Amino acid sequence: MSKISEAVKRARAAFSSGRTRPLQFRIQQLEALQRLIQEQEQELVGALAADLHKNEWNAYYEEVVYVLEEIEYMIQKLPEWAADEPVEKTPQTQQDELYIHSEPLGVVLVIGTWNYPFNLTIQPMVGAIAAGNSVVLKPSELSENMASLLATIIPQYLDKDLYPVINGGVPETTELLKERFDHILYTGSTGVGKIIMTAAAKHLTPVTLELGGKSPCYVDKNCDLDVACRRIAWGKFMNSGQTCVAPDYILCDPSIQNQIVEKLKKSLKEFYGEDAKKSRDYGRIISARHFQRVMGLIEGQKVAYGGTGDAATRYIAPTILTDVDPQSPVMQEEIFGPVLPIVCVRSLEEAIQFINQREKPLALYMFSSNDKVIKKMIAETSSGGVAANDVIVHITLHSLPFGGVGNSGMGSYHGKKSFETFSHRRSCLVRPLMNDEGLKVRYPPSPAKMTQH
């Protein structure tokens, strides 16, 4: 038996022992994870700096703080969520107990991603632990420093059998997917998401797939362009554009395209200076392969700003493209880099049509001072989530589930939705053995004639 199979077998045995069932045990494990973050914060920040060139402030406020907040929220709310939930009774069930009981699914596989390798690996794990599951954790091999660190420190704080960390690349992930799990959560590309779902189908394992897509950003003529462009520039170029819910491209009327370019440039210079390469706040591309892919998308385009790169350091300058042809390569795949195309449309209706002709994105953004424009855009399009007059922040809230639709994924998590995703809501009816006389009508033999209703 391979090491991977042995780890999954131990996780299954540990879950079957029943020790994750008591809420106190789950809370103890969440508190241990809390201590891990607090005591290993410098090591976590160092790994993020090595993998993605994140400085201490960005590492903490883009990744670490959200996990700490999620843990605190789970600990606070767990007794309420885990309690049996009474449901409405009928006249025939007045003497019965009717309720929904949340039970853990079993052994959950969480396959993390590299762009936010701490947050997007550990935050789903928090929900799975709170729901009482065993969790097999597979960090992304591309963020190798974080993957190595997690494999070292998690066993020092959490139950070693219940929460194993498996490192490796495609061969190890392929082997993992041959095992039987009770739920799989994967964050990454649509192509790999299809592979995950195919593997899960063998055992009818439910999946949560957090995928990507080209998240549109419509900028209406009727809005404060200074504010809009500052917020767009922040969300797009954070982490060097490597954010699954980053605005992928802008849709706007041609009459305001030049204004948008100038205001984006102004914000970028305020954020990162004249040379973003020297900025401690500006990230780097994760790998040489991704660097070449993103640089290739710029070729042949009309560059209004940036467009340069340094392969040795995997740096790509903040780049704005104008008058982009919707059929060009940069509009055919999720960019996942610091390149912002602008596509011109003549009306709100044309923007909606443009969005609806493409796969459903993970996020949809719009900037307008007109509530009717915002309501129309939301009503007539589909996406995993929406933010109006801002970007990205909707995924940071406990109260809003984070997930995709169609090609951008299925299922969701965050806050209470995480607990529900990793739980089976079991319908329960408990009936007394007395009063069987009242049930005689259901027993054979049935009457020869139907009575009048």
From Swiss-Prot:
Top-rank taxon = Eukaryota
Among the Pfam families in the record, one is: Aldedh
Gene Ontology BP terms? aldehyde metabolic process; lipid metabolic process; xenobiotic metabolic process
Q: What is the top EC class of this enzyme, as a single word?
A: oxidoreductase
Per the UniProt entry, the Enzyme Commission number(s) are 1.2.1.5
Q: Which family does it belong to?
A: Belongs to the aldehyde dehydrogenase family.
Q: What is this protein called?
A: Aldehyde dehydrogenase, dimeric NADP-preferring
**Organism the protein comes from:** Homo sapiens
Gene encoding the protein? ALDH3A1
